C-alpha cells in the first residue's frame, strides 16, 4: 500500500496501492473503487491524493496521470492534456518515418501514424518496452510487455499474436532485450537468461547459448 487518507467523516478512509479502496464504516469493510475492473475509467497504481472533505472533490495521481472525482470516488474524469508519458524506448518506421512507436511505462506500446502529438493509440497493453518494425515491410511489427512476452503483427499493428511461448519457462528481465539483424529482418535475437534466435521472423525459435547469468562478472 502506498498511502492512506482519512477525511472529516471518521468512518470514510482511502487506501492507495495497485487498486484504490475506500471504507465507509471505519475499516470494517473495504470497497475497490479503482482497479483493473474499471481501468477504462481510471488507471491502476495509485500514488497521491488530495481531498476536499466538505465537497467530495478528489484529485488522484497514478501511473496514468491525474484524475478527478466530485463524488468521493464513485466516478472519475481523466485530466488528459498533461504530457507525462514516460517512454522506455522508441522505434521509427524506416519506410514511413512519420510512423513512430514507443514502449511506455505502465501505459502500453503506443504509436502515431502521422507524427502529430494528438495522434497516438495503443497497439499492445501492459508496460511497453522495445518495438521493432521490419525495415522492408511496415506491416511486420514486434512489440513486448513485461517479463519477455513478445508479440508480432503482420497486418500493421491491427492484430498482435504472442510468439514468446518458446521461452515461457525461462527467467526473463522486466524489460527483455531483442534485436533484428540489419541485413536480414527475418533474423531476430531475444534475450532471456540465454539467447534465442529465429530465422523465420518469429515462427520458430531456438536457443543458441547456455545460461549467461552464472559466469564471471568481469
Question: Which residues make up each language-model segment?
Answer:
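Beta-propeller blade termini and top-face loops
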Residues: 1-218
Amino acid at each position: 500500500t502506498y498511502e492512506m487518507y482519512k477525511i472529516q467523516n471518521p468512518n470514510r478512509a482511502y487506501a492507495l496501492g495497485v487498486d484504490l479502496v475506500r471504507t465507509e464504516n471505519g475499516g470494517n469493510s473495504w470497497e475497490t473503487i479503482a482497479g483493473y475492473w474499471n481501468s477504462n475509467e481510471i488507471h491502476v497504481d495509485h500514488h497521491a491524493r488530495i481531498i476536499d472533505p466538505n465537497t467530495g472533490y478528489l484529485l488522484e495521481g497514478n501511473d496514468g496521470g491525474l484524475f478527478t472525482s466530485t463524488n468521493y470516488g464513485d466516478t472519475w474524469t481523466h485530466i488528459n492534456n498533461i504530457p507525462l508519458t514516460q517512454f522506455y524506448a522508441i522505434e521509427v518506421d524506416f519506410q514511413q518515418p512519420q510512423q513512430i512507436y514507443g514502449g511506455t511505462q505502465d501505459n502500453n506500446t503506443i504509436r502515431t501514424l502521422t507524427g502529430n502529438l494528438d495522434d497516438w493509440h495503443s497497439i499492445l497493453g501492459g508496460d511497453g518496452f522495445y518495438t521493432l518494425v521490419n525495415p522492408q515491410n511496415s506491416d511486420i511489427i514486434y512489440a513486448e510487455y513485461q517479463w519477455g512476452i513478445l508479440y508480432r503483427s503482420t497486418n500493421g499493428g491491427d492484430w498482435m499474436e504472442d510468439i514468446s511461448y518458446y521461452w515461457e519457462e525461462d527467467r526473463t528481465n522486466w524489460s527483455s532485450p531483442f534485436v533484428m539483424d540489419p541485413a536480414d529482418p527475418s533474423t531476430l535475437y531475444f534475450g532471456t537468461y540465454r539467447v534465442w534466435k529465429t530465422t523465420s521472423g518469429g515462427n520458430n525459435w531456438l536457443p543458441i547459448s547456455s545460461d549467461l547469468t552464472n559466469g564471471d562478472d568481469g
